[in-house]
Amino acid sequence: MSTLPPTPAVPPLVQTVWWLTRPINLMESCRRRVGDQFSVRFLGFERPMVMLSDPEAIRALYMEHSHGLPPGRTLTLMPILGPRSVLLLEGSEHLARRRLMLPAFHGERMRSYEGIVRDAAERQIASWPLEQPLALHPYMQALTLDVILRAVFGVSDAERGRRLREQLPRLLGLSASAGLQLRVLLSRRLRQGDPLERLREVTLEIDRLLLGEIAERRAEGRFEEREDILSLLMGARFEDDGQMSDRELRDQLLTLLLAGHETTATALAWTFDLLLRHPATLARLTAEVDEGSQDEYLRAVIAESLRLRPVVPLAGRRLATELRTGEWTLPAGTDVTPAIWLTHTRADLYPEPYSFRPERFLEGAPTTYGWIPFGGGIRRCLGASFAEFEMRVVLQTVLRERELEAVGSRPERMARRNVTLSPQHGTRVRVKRRVARPAPAAQPLVA
């Protein structure tokens, strides 16, 4: 008798293509036919993966810290981020690096980035063509990349910064291809060829740039005199008084660089798409921004956008011990993940779950494991607070300076790009200049 929930009645190849091309449709279909818990089988993986959406089951999964990472994360991310990335380490190694990196994204240090984010947003907005259709997502990517380079990496060499701005989008474009991901899975199964050859070439160029920055910083010393995260990490020490090597610093830098700008850019693109499809919500938010006295509705808009358009669909674990979830007892070694979209669209948690209604977050806070756009437990996204903070600053700046209108009548469909769900057509908008309004005298955004 199987100890795992049922799986769709189609071969693993079909499930794999289905997941790579229409992930939301796959999850919704399984929920309708099977229920809250189901298994899926993907090419290249020996075992099925169990997806679940009940907050109590998610709490039980995330509260057990001994569970490991599912192999899918390593397969997808290690060729890009490197083996020492905090996203890929486990156990004490993961916790030690998390402790070193977390202070950079909280408290006074994070608030000090507000001017940098606002300046980057204003410069980016000034470059937008007026009165013609454009895809907003690439502009959001350029904006958030500028922020992460200036505020987090503190690249001091202008030429190096320019080349990183060229190479990182290339790396993202190559890694986002569903066709590439399918070839990776098939190559594991057939043991033929290296589908990542082009991606490795771009990664080597980025390595050269990052390692060059690290070498110069190490030669200069005086890490305590700078406020960027690279200097913070280079000066930090583990409990045994050891430090990160140059190669490990490279892995952490690339992790922060990619995870810290692509996900936020995508979340911003989704938020604008939703706002432009809901004029009353946009009008209320714009009025709040103009008044400048509070940001409660802005926070609610962001929370609702992240609920209805979660950027990362999965945040799983490999069980170290058995897990009891409802009628199923899942054995150790099972790969289990919350299906974040399914959790966020449960009618018992969110009445009218497919409606964009930010007011629900003014009526009360979501349950801890019923709103998980950043994952949960000891692997919750390090930069979650920074991402929400950056989104607030960017949304305020755009709404003060420009008017946007949607191009086309249909909302964007979700398309899978590596580990993210992005607007299929990049959030098509038309931009108009807004009557100049000075930024209101308000208290700084609370991080």
How would you name each of these model-derived features?
Residues 263-288, 385-400:
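Cytochrome P450 catalytic-core helices
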Residues 1-96, 111, 115-123, 158-159, ...:
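N-terminal membrane-proximal hinge/A-helix region immediately C-terminal to the signal-anchor transmembrane segment
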Residues 14-38, 208, 292-326, 347:
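Conserved cytochrome P450 K-helix E-x-x-R motif and the immediately C-terminal K′/meander segment
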Residues 1-7, 69-78, 93, 109-266:
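Cytochrome P450 heme-thiolate monooxygenase catalytic core
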Residues 221-227, 284-296, 308-328, 343, ...:
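Cytochrome P450 fold signature focused on the C-terminal beta-domain
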Residues 338-364:
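Conserved cytochrome P450 K-helix/beta-meander segment immediately N-terminal to the heme-binding cysteine loop
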Residues 31-32, 121, 169-170, 290-293, ...:
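Cytochrome P450 proximal C-terminal region
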